[in-house]
C-alpha cells in the first residue's frame, strides 16, 4: 500500500464513520472504483478506525470523562449511582454486549459481503432507515433511558457488521425512535462506538502485524481519519440539531444505483 492510498482511505473513513452513510461500505466502494482490491483487507478497517476512535475521544472528552468518573464513583457511592455519568456508563456497557455477540458471531460470515454488489443493497436499506427516522425523539435524557433501550441500540449497532449498513445511522435512528433527544442519541451512539472500536483494534493487532504494513501508510490512515473524522463529527451534531438526518438517504441511493449499474455492466 502506498502512502497516497493510505491517506485516501483514511479520509474516506473519517468522513463516513460518523456521517450515517457507512464507512465500511464506502471503503469497499473506494477500493472498487480506484481498482485497488477486489476485497478490502481487514487491516485497513482496523487502522482507519483507530484514527476515528481518537476523534471521538477529543470531541466527546467531557462525556467520556463523565461516564468513566461516574462509573468508578458509583462503585462505592450510592449518591453517584443517581447521577447521569453512572447511568450512561452502564447503558453503554449494556448496549455493547449484544454488539459484541453479533460482531464476534457473524463478522466472519459478513466479511464475505465486502463486495460492491452487496454493499449497494445495504446502502439502499440504510437510506430507507434514515428517511423514516424522526427529526427528534421524545426529549428523554440518559436518566430516563431503560436497559431495553440500550440493548436495542446495541443490537442496531451490531447490524452494522454488514458492509453498507451505517453504524451511526442505525444506532442514532434507533435511539431517536426510542425517544432520546437529538443530542443524546449521537452521544450514546459514539460512546458505544468507542467500546466496540477499542475491542476491534485489540483483536486485530495480530492481523496488522502479519500483513507487515509499513509505518508510513499506517500513520497516514490514522492521521487522515482522525482529522476528517473530527470535522465530520462536529458537522453531524449540527445536522441533527437542524433535523436534517434524512437528507443523507438520497445520496446513499444515488451511490447505490451508480454502483449497481457499473457492476451490471462489468
From Swiss-Prot:
EC number: 3.6.1.27
GO MF annotation list: undecaprenyl-diphosphatase activity
Membrane protein topology class: Multi-pass membrane protein
Cellular localisation: Cell inner membrane
Catalytic function, reaction form: di-trans,octa-cis-undecaprenyl diphosphate + H2O = di-trans,octa-cis-undecaprenyl phosphate + phosphate + H(+)
UniProt key word Hydrolase: yes
Sequence intervals crossing the membrane: 1-21, 40-60, 90-110, 113-133, 145-165, 188-208, 217-237, 245-265
GO cellular component terms given for this protein: plasma membrane
Keywords for this protein: Antibiotic resistance, Cell inner membrane, Cell membrane, Cell shape, Cell wall biogenesis/degradation, Hydrolase, Membrane, Peptidoglycan synthesis, Transmembrane, Transmembrane helix
Keyword Cell inner membrane: yes
Gene Ontology BP term (one): peptidoglycan biosynthetic process
InterPro entries in the record: UppP (IPR003824)
EC category name: hydrolase
Function: Catalyzes the dephosphorylation of undecaprenyl diphosphate (UPP). Confers resistance to bacitracin.
Other facts: Bacitracin is thought to be involved in the inhibition of peptidoglycan synthesis by sequestering undecaprenyl diphosphate, thereby reducing the pool of lipid carrier available.
PANTHER family named in the record: UNDECAPRENYL-DIPHOSPHATASE
Protein family (similarity comment): Belongs to the UppP family.
Protein name: Undecaprenyl-diphosphatase
Organism: Acaryochloris marina (strain MBIC 11017)
Amino acid at each position: 500500500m502506498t502512502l497516497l492510498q493510505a491517506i485516501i482511505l483514511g479520509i474516506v473513513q473519517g468522513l463516513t464513520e460518523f456521517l450515517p452513510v457507512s464507512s465500511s461500505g464506502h471503503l469497499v466502494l473506494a477500493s472498487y472504483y480506484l481498482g485497488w482490491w477486489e476485497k478490502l483487507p481487514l487491516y485497513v478497517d482496523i487502522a482507519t478506525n483507530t484514527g476515528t476512535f481518537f476523534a471521538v475521544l477529543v470531541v466527546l472528552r467531557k462525556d467520556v470523562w463523565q461516564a468513566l468518573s461516574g462509573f468508578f464513583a458509583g462503585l462505592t457511592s450510592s449518591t453517584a449511582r443517581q447521577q447521569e455519568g453512572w447511568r450512561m456508563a452502564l447503558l453503554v456497557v449494556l448496549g455493547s454486549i449484544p454488539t459484541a455477540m453479533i460482531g464476534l458471531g457473524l463478522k466472519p460470515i459478513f466479511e464475505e459481503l465486502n463486495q460492491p454488489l452487496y454493499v449497494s443493497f445495504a446502502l439502499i436499506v440504510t437510506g430507507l432507515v434514515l428517511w423514516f427516522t424522526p427529526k427528534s425523539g421524545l426529549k428523554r435524557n440518559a436518566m430516563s433511558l431503560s436497559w431495553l433501550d440500550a440493548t436495542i441500540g446495541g443490537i442496531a449497532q451490531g447490524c452494522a457488521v454488514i458492509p453498507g449498513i451505517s453504524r451511526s445511522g442505525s444506532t442514532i435512528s434507533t435511539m431517536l425512535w426510542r425517544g432520546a433527544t437529538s443530542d443524546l442519541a449521537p452521544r450514546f451512539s459514539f460512546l458505544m462506538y468507542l467500546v466496540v472500536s477499542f475491542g476491534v483494534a485489540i483483536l486485530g493487532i495480530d492481523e496488522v502485524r502479519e500483513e507487515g504494513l509499513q509505518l508510513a501508510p499506517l500513520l497516514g490512515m490514522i492521521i487522515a481519519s482522525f482529522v476528517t473524522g473530527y470535522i465530520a463529527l462536529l458537522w453531524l451534531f449540527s445536522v441533527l440539531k437542524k433535523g436534517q438526518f434524512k437528507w443523507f438517504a438520497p445520496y446513499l441511493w444515488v451511490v447505490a444505483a451508480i454502483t449497481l449499474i457499473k457492476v451490471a455492466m462489468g
